[in-house]
């Protein structure tokens, strides 16, 4: 039989445990940024592009729970990586269009030697977000591609419209490209179904927040994807295409993260013939 003292001790321990988890998931982890460094093998990558770096930021969700100061911190961390390119993979605000101008202003401080590129997410107003970012020198790609040159060598940077809120068209996006390497920005990883049959080499996606809440030994109980937790976060190989799903830096629905730290990813491109 459990004594009154044992019951009280157990109850107090339970309450303290719940409070500790709550404090961690609400106050600590949502601001505890993880920086990942990942090498990506690209078939037939021109020699002049070997070692090119791309920093990815995703799912900023600027709102009262993701304030400007935190975005400033993320921008400083990206700039400290000295990337050649910055890729922004959608969902810049959450809940209100009033935050569009301020997130664009903060992102205008990003420094990249060869450009800052973006695609839209399902929370982004197309016209207002595209206009605000373009005004700050950020190129928004909507079912289109551009060549990126280093002397006579080049590859393609492409971006698609959002799978849910837009009109994603991979055929239009790639129309007119040749057999040179293709790097694709895409908000929703579910779009890999449409992409994996193309000759896109590398896809950067977001959207999932890594589930935002992950349970030890189980993983994320909820992921907003038709595939469940299959593409929750990390590196995936689909046919000849490599896809990386970034956990993002913001939050949605609830201002918490648990075992799904906000993430900035730095990719280094190398020829697929080179050792990893």
What function would you assign to each model-found segment?
Residues 57-58, 86-90, 115-122, 141, ...:
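Active-site neighborhood of phospho(di)ester-bond hydrolases with catalytic His/Asp-centered motifs
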Residues 1-18:
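N-terminal secretory signal peptides and thylakoid transit peptides that target proteins
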Residues 61, 93, 123-124, 145, ...:
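Catalytic metal-binding/acid-base residues of hydrolase active sites
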Residues 189-268, 273-274:
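Conserved beta-sheet core of the metallophosphoesterase superfamily
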Residues 63-149:
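Core catalytic region of metal-dependent phosphoesterases/phosphodiesterases
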